[in-house]
């Protein structure tokens, strides 16, 4: 007869790697066209002027300039790039 009871296997023990989301370029930081400004799930931030949105809701600069965060209607948070001559040089 066995003196040890068979141990049950745990269903835990897995964890996925973090997705590296968040703001990559902060307010008044200089950006060049194509720079990623925010990586997000859903639209926590909406694209303003000179900012595009990818299919995974990533916001990126369409022009060279300086990043600006502001609120719009319905308390939505927007990210814009204010184009400036020689901003990111």
UniProtKB/Swiss-Prot annotation:
Coiled coil: none annotated. Gene3D superfamilies: 2.40.50.100. It holds the Pfam family Ribosomal_L27. One of its GO terms (molecular function) is structural constituent of ribosome. GO terms for cellular component: ribonucleoprotein complex; ribosome. Residues 1-21 are annotated as: Disordered. GO terms for biological process: translation. This is Large ribosomal subunit protein bL27.
